[in-house]
Amino acid sequence: MGKIKIAVLLSGTGRTLDNFVEKIKKGDLKAEIVCVAASRTDCLGLKKAEKYGIPCAGFDIKDHKALSDEINKFVFKFNPDLIVLAGFMKMYYVPENYRFKVVNIHPALIPSFSGKGYYGMRVHKAVSESGVKVSGCTVHFVNERYDEGLIIAQKCVPVYAKDTPDDIAKRVFEAECKLYPQVINLFAENSIEVKNNKVYIKGE
């Protein structure tokens, strides 16, 4: 299995970037992070990318379409195979030539607790208040609507009555740290196929 070239888009602390770097070092993620782009110039994730020696750039642009355009100008210099959203808190407009080459991870089991306004701790607070017994994370393709792209993979975690939103968040992030690299590896293996508006994984 060859390495896949990925561009990482982020807005916050870069926890998922940390996870990717760690997994790559261990040989558990068959990827090369060719660049990092951030929707802010002051976020910790950007500083981490600099520390890791990864080419990076931040953009303070309010308009989502204009932001996507500027990010794409930067990202396309590195010709990534896959664009990976990792805590990217803006709408990203996918270029036509990158259809089914842009993925995101959501901290719940889509279609539950998803869509505009459901991000970060808001998701886990809603899960806690709902009384559901299962939550998890979802890796999906990015399209023109928040969290509505085709689902690629999901991982469940239990939710207990005594859980706080922080408890749920911790458990879900642990699941994310496993699932996201697994899905990226599937792309590296050319094991993902889209047919009839569904995602098929070879061998399943």
State where each predicted segment sits.
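One-carbon transfer enzymes
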Residues: 1-204
